[in-house]
Every structure is written in C-alpha cells, then in structure tokens.
Amino acid sequence: MLVFIRRVTQTTTVSEVTAEYIREEHVHILQHKEIPAYVGIFRIHGPFLFGATDKIDVIVNRLPNLPPIIILRLRNMTAIDSTGLQSLENLADRIHESRRQLILCGTREQPALRMREAKFHEHVGAEKICNSLAEALDRARELSPEAVKRHPAGSAWGRRNTDLPSAAAAAAGSAEA
C-alpha cells in the first residue's frame, strides 16, 4: 500500500503557469491572452492526496514575491482526500494572511464533490471558485482594484505583457528600429 501511495504522489506536481509553460504546450487556453501583471497562476497536476500535499510549498515559499491575486488551476487535479483539502485550506489561510486573494478554477468532479462536502466554498468564498480559467481571470479583473490597493507592493509587477509572444516580438521589432 505504501509503495502505491508513493508512486501515485510522485506523479503530482504543483507549478507556476509561466510564459515558457504556455509556449511549450501545443494548445493552451492562455495562448494569445494577456495575464494581468497583478495575477499569478499556479496549477496542481495529478492526485492531491496524503503524501503529495507538501508540494503546495512551491506556492507558500514564494508567497512574499507573488502578485496580489493568485489563481490556482485545478483542472488536472484528478483526486483529493481530506489531507489535500486541509492543505488547500491552509494555503488559502496563508494567502489571506499575506493580504492576497486566492481564486480556484477548473475543479474536476471528484475534487469538486469533496470540496462541496467539506464546505470549502465557505472557507474561501463561493465567488472565488470559478468553473474555468477564463472566468477566474474575469473575477481577478473585478477584484484587482481592491487587491492591488490592499497589497503593500501594489502594482510592482510588469512582467506579463512582455511574456506574450506578440508583445515580445513587437518589443524586439521596435528595439531594432
């Protein structure tokens, strides 16, 4: 049983959705879309079970340097158990304590059911649980004035426009002129 748990949790990853990640994918919902500078996007890929919950530290350890709104994409999180739910609640608390906003999106059937049973929406706010990444980005735009104002670093992020292939090409073209 322990060997099974270990192998399953080895397949789980928590990572930031970066410009490089988007470009490496063949088709990605974020291709040709601007990620606002005040938004950071992370994803959980694989089952988020006992034994894999420490992988959320990828976000926690970077929290002081992250923008005021964090979107956690759960589309590829195939399963969650009570330890995973507790870890997500702890993450939500840490993000809230840092005066940032957390938006969850794209939850699959099994994790969504477990989250509903645990009343997770009461912990983070039902308005911060979205069906899709597009909906989460819209919600982030609605929250942005409040989040940017509340966050000490305000609008110190300017990296996202240049992350886009078209913006980077335009910048390179104007630099050559």
Spans of model-derived segments:
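Cytosolic C-terminal regulatory domains/tails of membrane transporters and channels
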Residues: T9-A177
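Canonical bilayer-spanning transmembrane alpha-helix
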Residues: M1-T9
